[in-house]
Structures are given as C-alpha cells and as structure tokens.
A protein has these predicted regions:
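C-terminal catalytic "cap/lid" subdomain
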Residues: 1-236
Length: 236
C-alpha cells in the first residue's frame, strides 16, 4: 500500500480563513484513504504558535520551552483534524514509533511536532523516511519555492525544479530559532537528500494537493510549465 506524507502549513489553521479550507483538505485525504493510500499528515503550529512563542520570549523562556509550545499547538491542530475525518486515528502520536504503530492500523494519521529543536517540516521528512513514503508533499502559504520571497518581491519567480543543494544554499543563513522555520529548514532538506525522498512543495490547498499527487507519477521530462508547485531533486 502506498504511503504519502503531507506537511500541512500552519497557515491552514488561521482563524481568519475559517473552517472551509480545513474541511476541503481533510475530505481530500479521506478520499485518498478510500482509494487505498495511507496518509500521514503533519500539522504546523502557524500564527498561534508564533504568537505564544513571542509572548513567552518576553518572559525569557528558553528555546527548548518555546519549541515545546510550538509542538503543543501543532498537536492541537492535529487533534482538530481528527474531528473532521472519518478515516483518521483518533489519537495524536507523540513519538516517531507511535506514528509508525498508528499507521499500521489506521489509513490516516494526523501528527503535530515530535521533538524540541525540530521543525514540523523536519518531523514530516523523518516520517516520510521511516514510512518509506512514495511521496512527501510540503505545503506552504505560497505556491512553491521562489527565487526570492514572493510576499516581499512581486518579481519573484516560481521555480519548477530545485536541487537539495540549491535549496540548502537558500536557507543556510536562516536563523534557527523557535517559530522561525518557514519553507524548509536544514534538517528537513538533508533528510530528503540522504533518503532521496520524492518531494513536492505546493500551496496548502486541496486542489493543489490532488494535482501534485497525480503529477507525481509523471517523469521529469513530461513536466510542463503549468505543473503544480516545485519538485525537489535530492542531489548533493
């Protein structure tokens, strides 16, 4: 049975966007499960986690505790997803071993973060590695990997393909403190690279998830300019 691991952007859980986006994505995942696909979806902490971490910093909380706040929020988000799905395991895993155990008996497992010092991107990449996932989809609040931040530069171009080496060079100077992980952090990229995980970066949207899965079966030479998101090539 094929396994797909999906990192769900924390932006999905913004209270401003309402529940419709969550419902559409969970419906898509339930549909995959009905078609015999195992799904592990890792929820991000998003704005709520960042706001809590920002407040805790004013009280001089250390980075490990800030990470734990982020993990706790992401697990609440994961639990929220279980209330929408009729295919998911009702329990939220707290270790990688629990993720693996739950996925043997349930077609869908929703997870939050697992360990302090590790982004939910890295958590999802580790799960993809351990489950030998056929596909890892990393969803963000933009359409994929761009030449620069598209929220700050209107001339930024979407990159259809990028190697892990190129991606590493883009993030190597990022500050690795709690709540600052954005597209991907160093650990998630190195996991993708070492295990040659088939990875696509897309916007957190149900239609894009469907498109990315269908396009993932296409060889690179058949990809067209309008294909969904960015493919990451695990090249060192």
């Amino acid at each position: 049975m094929k396994t797909i691991v999906i990192k769900l952007s924390g932006s999905l859980f913004s209270m401003d966007s309402g529940p419709s986006g969550i419902k559409k994505i969970v419906k898509t995942l339930d549909g995959l499960a009905r078609n015999g696909v195992k799904v592990v979806a890792v929820a991000g902490g998003g704005k709520l986690a960042r706001d809590i971490q920002k407040t805790a910093r004013t009280f001089h909380a250390d980075e490990a505790l800030l990470d734990q706040f982020g993990i706790d929020v992401s697990r609440i988000h994961a639990k929220l997803l279980t209330t929408v799905s009729n295919k998911a395991c009702p329990d939220i895993p707290t270790t990688l071993d629990e993720v693996l155990r739950y996925s043997t008996s349930h077609p869908i497992v929703f997870s939050g973060g697992l360990s302090p010092g590790q982004s939910t991107n890295a958590t999802a990449a580790l799960i993809a590695e351990r489950t030998k996932a056929k596909l890892f989809i990393n969803t963000t609040d933009v359409d994929g990997v761009f030449t620069s931040d598209p929220r700050k530069n209107k001339n930024a171009k979407l990159m259809k393909v990028i190697s892990t080496k190129e991606l590493l060079s883009k993030v190597v100077d990022d500050k690795m403190s709690a709540g600052t992980y954005d597209l991907m952090d160093l650990l998630s990229i190195k996991i993708i690279e070492r295990s040659k995980i088939h990875t696509i970066v897309i916007k957190c949207d149900s239609r894009q998830i469907k498109s990315a899965i269908s396009e993932s079966e296409l060889p690179m030479r058949k990809l067209v300019r309008k294909s969904t998101g960015t493919r990451i090539l695990p090249l060192s």
